[in-house]
């Protein structure tokens, strides 16, 4: 008698993004109670941006495409409309650019010397890094690395 293969649970299928989200919530809670003028408080502010960037990267590369980037999954072959194909093939870059622009607007309207203004500035930096990594991996190679083709 063959054993029926069970599909993985929701927690198992999403354990990476859930773990990253839990780390981010933990850092947000600690930062909200810390003194941003101390080394430790400043560290937590930077860590929020870094871990948010990792979480966004994991989730965005799961749902969006970027043709030629080692950081993106491959689109299904059944998309035939040119505009739709362009939007789909570059949806990862488009999504990161649009959400990054929203972070920039928020940053420009915030007090950069405030506790959360510094965090938003770090998030803008992390967003630029993620977008840069997606674009760079379209054209640059690293032997032995998935990201470099």
Regions found by a protein language model. Give the residues of each.
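A structural feature that tracks compact, well-ordered secondary-structure segments
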Residues: 31-33, 37-63, 70, 105-142, ...
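Hydrophobic core of alpha-helical transmembrane segments in multi-pass integral membrane proteins
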Residues: 19-29, 94-105
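Sequence termini and other peripheral, non-core segments
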Residues: 1-10, 22, 26-29, 115-118, ...
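Alpha-helical transmembrane segments and their helix-start/interface "positive-inside/aromatic belt" motifs
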Residues: 3-21, 82-96
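Membrane-helix interface/capping segments
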Residues: 66-79
């Amino acid at each position: 008698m063959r054993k029926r293969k069970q599909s993985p649970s929701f927690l198992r299928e999403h354990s990476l993004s859930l773990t990253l989200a839990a780390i981010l919530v933990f850092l947000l809670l600690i930062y909200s109670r810390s003194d941003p003028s101390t080394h430790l408080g400043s560290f937590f502010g930077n860590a929020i941006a870094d871990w948010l960037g990792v979480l966004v990267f994991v989730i965005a590369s799961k749902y969006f495409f970027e043709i030629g980037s080692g950081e993106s999954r491959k689109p299904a072959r059944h998309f035939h409309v040119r505009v739709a194909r362009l939007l789909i093939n570059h949806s990862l870059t488009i999504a990161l650019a649009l959400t990054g622009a929203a972070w920039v607007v928020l940053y420009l309207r915030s007090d950069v010397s405030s506790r959360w203004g510094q965090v938003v500035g770090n998030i803008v930096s992390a967003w630029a890094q993620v977008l840069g990594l997606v674009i760079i991996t379209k054209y640059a190679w690293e032997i032995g690395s998935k990201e470099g083709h």
